[in-house]
Curated annotation (Swiss-Prot):
Pathway: Carbohydrate biosynthesis; gluconeogenesis. Belongs to the iron-sulfur dependent L-serine dehydratase family. This is L-serine dehydratase 1. It catalyses: L-serine = pyruvate + NH4(+). It comes from Escherichia coli (strain K12). Its cofactor is [4Fe-4S] cluster. The keyword Transit peptide does not apply. Also deaminates threonine, particularly when it is present in high concentration. The gene is sdaA. Signal peptide: none annotated. Gene3D superfamilies: D-3-phosphoglycerate dehydrogenase, domain 3. It is an enzyme of class 4 (lyase). One of its GO terms (biological process) is gluconeogenesis.
């Protein structure tokens, strides 16, 4: 059973699959070298990056992430401000300090990081890391970054975790989830909490989700108070700060009944602009879609009631349980199923979480989740210039408003839905697999080839 800790991971931008996952892979590789007693024998390290990781890797900072992982850093704790200087030193000296400075190796500028357009056999986001002693390979590993910051090595691809802990309500589908809720009388968030308590203590759960919400709030605060231009060739100006000033200073806006939409847009823009700048964010379930879940909870906090620990925990439990269904039965990787697996899933999760907070039954929560995905089916992932900026930032704002609408529609529905959550998850996955690779995070089609950099 997937822990909801894994659905909401603190990390750095701009991408969970192309930044967070590769950093974790680099860290895992160097940890293996230490554990196997090989670190001191290594004289050179080289990396091969494939598929979507290669095609959009520069714009997504994949190369930087792998280097920082090999240096011994983790996404949740890496010192973001230190990254540019560290990378500059590696490039200038063509040397890389591994495992928090324990051992230095060659990392040539020309072939230390090699980008390949083709895919490895098991997934669109593949990478290989090699450690050499002279010309001899002393250790090599193939990793796949499968979305949302999850990584798996080649040997364990498609396998269940060997140390998987049993939970009291091991649902694999929305149908099973609802059956457990009906049988026990638990709300959807309550049932998810019972499973989580089999994996973590109550204290660990409380502390973890307090940190998640604090990180989201800090990200919103930074984003709506920071001006300037986002990094990269597109020179995209930040918009959240100007929108915030407009909202707090205009009497005309304050009397507009649609004013709340502007606030929701601002919350989402703030988060995704921080993500695009490589800031500290929370996967929800990915970085490319990290603005939707916090924007909807910030909406609840500002316009319905102040968010308490009980409220944000219920929200994350319901949203996370829905996200886990997509992770188990479909994909949350834009490189595998397009943006419907990122923004679509985040919209579905946020709609479910909000429906839970608004008093929805488990059935209504699942209807909200279904609506949130149904109207994102077929959504392509075509980042312009390989950056997580256009259309990604604005798309998060649109989907945040859509999630609120989905929750409200679900709660006010008086007839039985014709489309189930399980069927929409199945449809999303099949649609993604049928989607031309041009539209799955390769920047080879759609807006990515129509919008030119200046």
């Amino acid at each position: 059973m997937i822990s909801l800790f894994d659905m909401f991971k603190v990390g750095i931008g701009p991408s969970s699959s192309h930044t967070v996952g590769p950093m974790k892979a680099g860290k895992q590789f160097v940890d293996d070298l230490v554990e196997k007693g090989l670190l001191d024998s290594v004289t050179r390290v080289a990396v091969d990056v494939y598929g979507s990781l290669s095609l959009t890797g520069k714009g997504h900072h994949t190369d930087i992430a792998i280097i920082m992982g090999l240096a011994g850093n983790e996404p949740a704790t890496v010192d973001i401000d230190s990254i540019p200087g560290f990378i500059r030193d590696v490039e200038e000296r063509e040397r890389l300090l591994l495992a928090q400075g324990r051992h230095e190796v060659d990392f040539p500028r020309d072939n230390g990081m090699r980008f390949h357009n083709g895919n490895l056999p098991l997934h669109e986001n593949g990478m290989q890391i090699h450690a050499y002693n002279g010309d001899e390979v002393v250790y090599s590993k193939t990793y796949y970054s499968i979305g949302g910051g999850f990584i798996v090595d080649e040997e364990h691809f498609g396998q269940d975790a060997a140390n998987e802990v049993s939970v009291p309500y091991p649902f694999k589908s929305a149908t099973e989830l609802l059956a457990y809720c009906n049988e026990t009388g638990y709300s959807l968030s309550g049932l998810a909490m019972q499973n989580e308590l089999a994996l973590h203590s109550k204290k660990e759960i409380d502390e973890y989700f307090a940190h998640v919400w604090q990180t989201m709030q800090a990200c919103i605060d930074r984003g709506m108070n920071t001006e300037g231009v986002l990094p990269g060739p597109l020179r995209v100006p930040r918009r959240a700060s100007a929108l915030r000033r407009m909202l707090v200073s205009s009497d005309k806006l304050s009397n507009d009944p649609m004013n709340v939409i502007d606030w929701v847009n601002m919350f989402a823009l703030a988060v995704n602009e921080e993500n695009a700048a490589g800031g500290r964010v929370v996967t929800a379930p990915t970085n490319g879609a990290c603005g939707i879940v916090p924007a909807v909870l910030a909406y609840y906090d500002h316009f319905i009631e102040s968010v308490s620990p009980d409220i944000y925990t219920r929200y994350f439990m319901a949203a996370g349980a829905i996200g886990a269904l997509y992770k188990m039965n479909a994909s949350i990787s834009g490189a595998e199923v397009g943006c419907q697996g990122e923004v679509g899933v985040a919209c579905s999760m946020a709609a479910a979480g909000l429906a839970e907070l608004l008093g929805g039954s488990p059935e209504q929560v699942c209807v909200a989740a279904e609506i949130g995905m149904e109207h994102n089916l077929g959504l392509t992932c075509d980042p312009v210039a390989g950056q997580v900026q256009v259309p990604c930032i604005e798309r998060n704002a649109i989907a945040s408003v859509k999630a609120i609408n989905a929750a409200r529609m679900a709660l006010r529905r008086t007839s039985a839905p014709r489309v189930s959550l399980d069927k929409v998850i199945e449809t999303m996955y099949e649609t993604g697999k049928d989607m031309n690779a041009k539209y799955r995070e390769t920047s080879r089609g759609g807006l990515a080839i129509k919008v030119q950099c200046d």
